Amino acid sequence: DFHPQCGKKIFGSKTVPLLPYTKADIKQLAEQVIRSQTTLTGVQAKLSLDISSSPNQPQRFTIVGLWGRYILKPQTEQFKYMPEVEDLTMHLAELAKVNVVPHSLIRFADGELAYITKRIDRTAKGEKLPMEDMCQLSERLTEYKYKGSYEKIAKIIMQYSSVPKLDVINFWEQVVFSWLTGNADMHLKN
């Protein structure tokens, strides 16, 4: 399904790693991850993946808990076509010149589509890169992530940015794009 350059853009290789799971596998594996309390936060169900390889075997994705370099969002029963909608929205954001993370649709072993994105808070070796979000910069706890305003965020950007005017323009472009595409989840952690 992948054009070689598209594979290289997100996976660093023209050969796309195998996603050897089916939707049924993912449901079981997700339950195990939840029981082990190593889940990624957020509204949508998601799993952390990394690429593993061994001699004479193709690269493949494995579920790794919190520290993977990729995030996988499978289809859900409640909201059909969420992976397709998220990928389309990210492509529209790119066309609107909004900076986005590397992303794509990928097929499970049974052919079902899932959304995959590369984490920007990890190095190529999977080491954590320090990043701050607006909760941290506004000194709010995560449980108060919905208790902010666009005005407050703009003021924080003006206070901490090394290029505040450019960053505030970029921020407002993201706000307008989110409004146009119906993204109502732009809280202080996003």
Model-derived regions: residue spans:
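Phosphate/dinucleotide-binding and metal-coordinating scaffold of catalytic cores
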Residues: 1-190
